[in-house]
Every structure is written in C-alpha cells, then in structure tokens.
Amino acid sequence: MDDRRRFHRLQTQMRAQYFLKEKKGGWEECTVIDVSRKGVGIKFHKPKNIPVGSVIHLEVFPPKELEPVVLNGVLKRIEQEGDDLIGGVELKEVLDGNKLARLG
C-alpha cells in the first residue's frame, strides 16, 4: 500500500486525555500510539460515537515530565480495533522539534 504521509510517524505508548469541542462532557482517557510533526494516532478506551471531523483537544503526558503537551486537531479517521477505537488526528500546527522530542 502506498503511504502518502508527509512526515514519518514514531510509534509510542503515552497516556493522554481528550476533550471533544462538539460534545458536552469532560475529559476522557486515551493513549497516543504514534506521533508525527502533523498528526497523532490515538487509541480511545471507551468507545463512543466520535464523528470524523470532530475538533479534538489533547493533553499528552510524556513519562517523567510534570507538564502535559497540549495539542489540537481534527479527527480524520476512526476504526474499530478489538474493544477499542483507533483514530487519526491531523494537528492544527506542525510540531516543532521540542514538542516532537517530548512526544517521541
């Protein structure tokens, strides 16, 4: 399959939480499973109806750091994988080297 991504993705497993702008409710737990300069892959642990196109706010908690990395983006794809949902988020900004290093 042809991989058309502009940026290389780094595999990871980082605790995170997300909030959907369009939905009423609080933060939900998730795991960031990969990261690139312009996107992240997320494993949603409590599957619910999350429509493609949703604006998503993320706080990612790198190991051994006190402050989370805050990211904002749009959900571009979502699919079922076992009991979880796996989503792809296109970030609103290209990550600088510092943020990418904290996440990778």
Question: What does each model-found stretch correspond to?
Answer:
Residues T31-I33, G41-K43, G87-K92:
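Short, acidic/hydrophobic/Gly-rich beta-strand patch recurrent on exposed beta strands
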Residues K21-K23, R37-K38, I78-D83:
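Short, conserved beta-turn/loop elements at beta-strand boundaries and strand-helix junctions
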Residues K23-G25, G82-G104:
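C-terminal output/interaction extensions
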Residues D34, L75-E79, E93:
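A residue-level detector for short acidic-glycine micro-motifs
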Residues R15-K21, G53-V69:
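Short conserved beta-strand and strand-loop elements enriched in small hydrophobics
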Residues E28-T31, L71-K76:
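Short beta-strand-centered aromatic/proline hotspots
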Residues D2-R5, V40-K46:
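Short alpha-helix capping/helix-loop boundary micro-motifs
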Residues M1-V35:
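N-terminal helix initiation/capping motif
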